[in-house]
C-alpha cells in the first residue's frame, strides 16, 4: 500500500466560521452528558434529586479538566517550560486521566460536605458514569491519533477483525500502531457492565467506587505497558505506578473501613 493512500478521519468535526470544533472535545462532552444521564437516573432512584448531580458536574468537570492538564504539564515540563504558550492548548489532547480523577475526587468531597450528603453515596452512584465517560473519551484519543501503542503490521490489525476505519486511523506517518485506546475503551465498557450488575448486590457504601478504581487501574496498568507516549518519571511509567498505588490504597480502604465500622451502611440505604 502506497504511503498516503490510507483514508483517515478528520480531527475537526465542524467548522464554525474561523473556529474549528474538534472531535476530541465533542467526544469528551458526549461522555460527560451520557455519564450525567446515568447518574441522575440512579440518583433519583436512591432519593437524590437530579439537580444535585447537574450542579456537581458543572463544578467538577472544569476542575477535573484543569487538574488533568496540570498533571500532564508537570510530567512534560521539559517541553512546556520551553513552550509556555502551549500549556493552555488542549485541542490536540494532553489531558491525563489520573490528574482529572484527583481533581474530581477533591471536588466531590468538598461538594458533599457543603451539601450535607454522603460522599461515598455520591461516589458509588457516580462510579459507572465516570467509567462510561472514560470509555467514550478514549475515542477522542482515537480521533487525535494519540495514546497508541508500538508499531504493528496491517495484517496484525486485520487479524483482530477491526473495521477499516479503525485500522486506517492507526496508520500514522507511514506506520501502523497498536490501537491501545480501543483496548482500554473495551475494558472500561466491560467495567461499566460489571458496576451496573454490582448495584444489585447491595455492597457496603463506598465499595462500588473502590471497585471502579480497582477495575480501571488493573486495565490501565496492562494497557499502559503497550503505549509509546507514557508520562515518565525516570524509568517508571507514571500511570503504572499510579495504578498500583490506587489498587493497594483501595483494598486498604475497604479493609480498614470495615474493621472500623465505617462501612456499615449499604448502597441501597437512604
From Swiss-Prot:
Pfam families named among the record's database cross-references: LGT (PF01790)
Its EC number(s): 2.5.1.145
Membrane topology listed for this record: Multi-pass membrane protein
This protein's record includes keyword Cell membrane: yes
Enzyme class, first EC level, given as a word: transferase
Domain of life: Bacteria
GO biological process, one term: lipoprotein biosynthetic process
Keywords: Cell membrane, Membrane, Transferase, Transmembrane, Transmembrane helix
Membrane-spanning ranges: 19-39, 54-74, 92-112, 116-136, 178-198, 206-226, 236-256
Official protein name in the record: Phosphatidylglycerol--prolipoprotein diacylglyceryl transferase
Species annotation: Bacillus mycoides (strain KBAB4)
Source species taxonomy: Bacteria, Bacillati, Bacillota, Bacilli, Bacillales
